[in-house]
Amino acid sequence: MLAMKEKNKTPKDSMTLLPCFYFVELPIVASSIVSLYFLELTDLFKPAKVGFQCYDRALSMPYVETNEELIPLLMLLSLAFAAPAASIMVGEGMVYCLQSRLWGRGPGGVEGSINAGGCNFNSFLRRTVRFVGVHVFGLCATALVTDVIQLATGYHTPFFLTVCKPNYTLLGTSCESNPYITQDICSGHDTHAILSARKTFPSQHATLSAFAAVYVSMYFNAVISDTTKLLKPILVFAFAIAAGVCGLTQITQYRSHPVDVYAGFLIGAGIAAYLACHAVGNFQAPPAEKVPTPAPAKDALRALTQRGHESMYQQNKSVSTDELGPPGRLEGVPRPVAREKTSLGSLKRASVDVDLLAPRSPMGKEGMVTFSNTLPRVSTPSLDDPARRHMTIHVPLDASRSRQLIGEWKQKSLEGRGLGLPDEASPVHLRAPAEQVAEEEEEEEEEEEEEEEEEEEEGPVPPSLYPTVQARPGLGPRVILPPRPGPQPLVHIPEEGVQAGAGLSPKSSSSSVRAKWLSVAEKGGGPVAVAPSQPRVANPPRLLQVIAMSKAAGGPKAETASSSSASSDSSQYRSPSDRDSASIVTIDAHAPHHPVVHLSAGSTPWEWKAKVVEGEGSYELGDLARGFRSSCKQPGMGPGSPVSDVDQEEPRFGAVATVNLATGEGLPPPGASEGALGAGSRESTLRRQVGGLAEREVEAEAESYYRRMQARRYQD
C-alpha cells in the first residue's frame, strides 16, 4: 500500500540527469581509477630520494613479503569498497520498502521517481547509484592523495635498509666521518621492494580504511531509525574497528611507522566527512518543492462578530477611538459624527448591511455595530457646544472699501436692468426675472460649496453662526461684532432720512433739508423722466453698501439677520417664511465704532443706533449725493436710550428710518407726488426698488442655505 502511494505520484521529468551522469560524473570516476592504476601498479612515477643514516636501526626492521601480509593492498581495496557498497545497497533496499516509516519523518521526505531519456528511475536506483558512486570516487581520491604524498615525500619504511642492502664502500669514506648518506648505494636486487620501501607516509591502508569506515558510519547514522537502539552502534563500531585493525597491522608488521598510520587516519576521515556532507547531502532526500498555498481569505463578517458588544464596552477610550476612528478626526474642534460605510461585497449576503460608526466619544451603547437592516440605525447625538451657538462678526466700515463695493453693485445693477426696467408703480414687478434669480442662486450655491470645501481642507471651521449678545444692566443688551475670516454677513441698513412729505418738520432744520434736496435735484438735471431703455442709477449709500458687501463675500447671506433678531435656539431651524417678518435690525453704517443694539420694550424688533460724532462728515457717493453732508447731532440718542424715545422725536435729516421691505411698511404710496422733493423722491423710489430686489435675493439665498443646513443635519 505504501509502495502504491509512491508509485501513484506523478514522476518528474529531468533533462540533466543522464547527461550529467554520462559526461561529468562517470568520466571523473574513470579518470581517477586510471590514475590510480598508473600510480600503484606501474613504476612510471618514482618517489623522491631521501638520505639516511648509516646503520640506522629504525630502518633495519625485517621485511615481510607482500603475500605474507595480513591485509594486502588488493584485499584492502576490495574490502574498503565491497563492504560499504553492500551495506549501502541493503540499506537502500530497506528504505525503499519502508520509506514512509523511515523517510517520512526526515526533513527531506520521500523521493519520487524521475523520467529521464525515456526511462523511469525510482528512488532506490537513484539513491544507490549516487551513494555508492560517491563512495567509489572517495576511495579513488583517497588513494590518489596518499600516493601523491608518498611520492612527494619519499620517506623510508622501517624495512628500507633490509631491502636496500647499502654498499658503504662505494662512499669512499667511513660512516664515522660522514654518517648521513644521500647517494644511492643500494645493492639489493628486488627493485619493487626498494621502491615500496621509499613510500610510507602516509599509510595507504590507514587512509583507505578510515575513509570507508567514516563514510559508511555516517550513512548508518542518517538512514537507520532511532527505534533500533543497537543496530546502528554495532555497524558503526564494526567498521571503525576494521579500519583500526588495518592501520595497526601496518605498524606490527613494520610496514609503516606509527606516525604514518595516524596521519592516514586523519586524511581518510576528512575526505569521507567532506563527501558525505557536501556530495550526497548527508544522505538525505532533497527538499521537495512546495507549491505556495494562498492564504485563506479572511471572513469579514466572522471577524466582526467575534468582536462582541461586551468586549467593545470594556475597551477604554483610546483603544476604541484608535480602532474605529481615524486620528485626523479626533483632533481640533469636534465635528458632527460621520458614518463610514465599509464595502463588504465579498460576503455575498443581500440581507446584511454593516455600518461602522466612528464616534469621537468613548465607546458605549451608541457605538455598537448593527448587522441587520431591520434594526434601527444607531447614531450618536450631535455634540453641539454652547459656544458654537454664537459667533462674532466684524462689519468693515472703511470708506474706500465701501466705494469699491458700491461700484461693483452699480455694475451688477446695470447689467441686471439692461434686460428691461420693470414698472415703478407696481411693487410686484420689483422682482428680477425667475431665470436670472435661478442662475444667481446656482452660482451662489457653487461658490458656497467651494468655500466649504476650502474651509474643510484648511482645518476645523470655527463656530461662527450667531453673534454674541452681552447683557448690560441698565443699558440694554450689546452685540459685539469682532472680525472673522470668511464671508461678510448681510446686515440690513435702512435708507437715510427720506420720508413722506407730510412728515417734514416745520422747524429750522427742515428748511435746510429742503434746500439741500433742491440743490441735488438741480445738479441731477431736474425732474426729468428716465426712459425704460436707459437704466437709472440710484446711490442709496447705506443699503447698497451692505448688500454689496454680502454679494462680494459669496457666503451665507441670511445668517446674521436671523441670528441677531432672535435667540440662539429658534431661528436656525426655521425657514424664512416661518420667522417673524417684523424682526428687522437697523444700523448706522457710518458709525465710527461698533454699533450698539437697542432692545425695545415688549416684542418689538431691535434697532441698532450709533453715536454720531459732531463734525464728522460722510463720504460722497455718486452724482445724486455729491452734496450730501452729515454734521448734525441727534438729541436723545444715547447708547442706552430705547427705540420708543427716539421714535417720539421729530424726524431730522440724518435720522435712522426703519423700513420693513418684506411687508412694505414705511414705504410711500405708489402714486406719491414728487413735487416736494423732486429728484430726491425718485431716488427714494429707486432705492426701494433695489431694496425689494435685494430682499427677494436674500430670501432665496436664505431658503437654499437653510435647506442645505437641514439636509446636512439629517445626514449627521
From Swiss-Prot:
Record's GO cellular component terms: membrane
UniProt xrefs under InterPro entries: P_Acid_Pase_2/haloperoxi_sf, P_Acid_Pase_2/haloperoxidase, PA_PP_rel
BP GO terms, sorted: phospholipid metabolic process
Keywords assigned: Glycoprotein, Membrane, Phosphoprotein, Transmembrane, Transmembrane helix
Glycosylation sites: N167, N316
Location of Phosphoserine modifications: S320, S351, S426, S505, S641
Chain intervals for the UniProt region annotation (Disordered): 311-335, 416-515, 548-589, 630-651, 663-693
Family: Belongs to the PA-phosphatase related phosphoesterase family.
Designated name of the protein: Phospholipid phosphatase-related protein type 3
Species, as recorded: Mus musculus (Mouse)
